[in-house]
Amino acid sequence: MFSSKIRDLRVERDLNQEEVANGIGVGKNTYLAYEKGTQSPKLETVEKLAKFYGVPIAELVSDSETNIDEKLKSKIRMIESLDEPEKESLFILMEALLMRSKSREIQKEFR
C-alpha cells in the first residue's frame, strides 16, 4: 500500500515527517495524511516523493497484494523517461481528465 511504502522508506532513512514534507514541498499535515492513507497525493507529488527517496515511481505505487498490471507499469516507466516539461504537460492533462470525469459523476448525481 502506498501509505505504508512511504512510511517505511522514511523510517529506513531515519527521517521525520517534517523533513520529508519540506523535501517535497508540502505541509507536514499533508504528508502525515499521505502516510495515514487519508489523502492521496497528486501525480506530481508522487514524482517528487520518488525523486526524494531515489526510487522509481512504480515502486511507490505498485502493491504486492494487488499487483498493478504490466500495461500500467509500462506506462509509468514511460512517464519516468520524459523530461520535466513533458511530465508537467502530461500531469496537467491527466488532472484535467480526472476533473472532467469527476464533474460528470457529480452531474449524474443531480439529474
From Swiss-Prot:
One of its GO terms (molecular function) is DNA binding. Transmembrane segments: none annotated. Pfam families: HTH_3 (PF01381). The keyword Transcription applies. InterPro entries: Cro/C1-type_HTH, Lambda_DNA-bd_dom_sf. Residues 6-60 form the HTH cro/C1-type domain. SMART domains: HTH_XRE (SM00530). CDD domains: HTH_XRE. Keywords: DNA-binding, Repressor, Transcription, Transcription regulation. Residues 17-36 bind DNA. Transcriptional repressor of the integrated CTXPhi phage gene rstA2. This is Cryptic phage CTXphi transcriptional repressor RstR.
